[in-house]
């Protein structure tokens, strides 16, 4: 929210904390480019980078980057829980290929996500807070629709953005997501 007040240093600090907690906020950074303008966006980006380095420095070891990369790959190519479109693609994969195609699909999904980030940050105006929130909601919705793993807790971001933008579908999604647990029921 500090970015919306164009306080780029403080906004960068809080974004670095968010990224240090979960990588998902990295996807949202480009949405501030048009709103902040080039100069302020560079300040914002450099403050995120600087504060992130300070946050990660105590944990940095030679093999950390490799281990972190492997963890992200594992997330995209191995885990599966409550994935919307993924389940449809997986069923088609079983029908066409005869096996679970998560490893192949997981290698493509990050590129689709990057493409969507560029699409939503460059094609949408994002010059007003309401437009930024709408772009964030659309991107995160697409991301979660494509994801192989979506825990119900992840929908909190969508609910928050849905409230800010007036969209109700995140609330509906959060109400029906618990039906997915029926697939894991006993008997």
Q: Model-found features: residue ranges?
A:
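Membrane-interface transmembrane helices that cradle and orient dolichyl/undecaprenyl
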Residues: 1-10
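Transmembrane-lumen/periplasm boundary regions of multi-pass, lipid-linked membrane glycan transferases
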Residues: 50-75, 157
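Perimembrane helix-loop-helix junctions
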Residues: 27-50
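Membrane-interfacial loop-to-transmembrane alpha-helix junctions, especially the N-terminal start
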Residues: 44, 128-136, 166-174
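Transmembrane helices and adjacent periplasmic/lumenal helix-loop junctions
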Residues: 9-34, 54, 145-154, 168
């Amino acid at each position: 929210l500090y970015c919306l007040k164009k306080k780029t240093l403080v906004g960068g600090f809080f974004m670095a904390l968010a990224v240090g907690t979960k990588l998902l906020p990295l996807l949202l950074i480009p949405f501030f480019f048009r709103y902040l303008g080039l100069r302020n966006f560079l300040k914002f980006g450099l403050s995120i980078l600087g504060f992130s380095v300070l946050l990660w420095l105590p944990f940095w070891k030679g093999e950390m980057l490799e281990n972190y990369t492997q963890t992200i790959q594992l997330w995209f190519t191995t885990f599966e829980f409550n994935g919307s479109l993924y389940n449809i693609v997986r069923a088609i994969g079983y029908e066409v290929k005869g096996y679970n195609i998560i490893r192949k699909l997981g290698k493509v999904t990050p590129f689709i996500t990057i493409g969507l980030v560029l699409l939503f940050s460059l094609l949408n105006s994002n010059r007003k807070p309401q437009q930024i929130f709408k772009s964030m909601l659309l991107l995160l919705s697409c991301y979660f629709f494509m994801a192989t793993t979506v825990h119900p807790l992840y929908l909190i971001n969508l609910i928050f953005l849905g409230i800010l933008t007036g969209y109700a579908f995140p609330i509906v999604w959060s109400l029906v997501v618990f039906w997915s647990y029926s697939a894991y029921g006993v008997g």
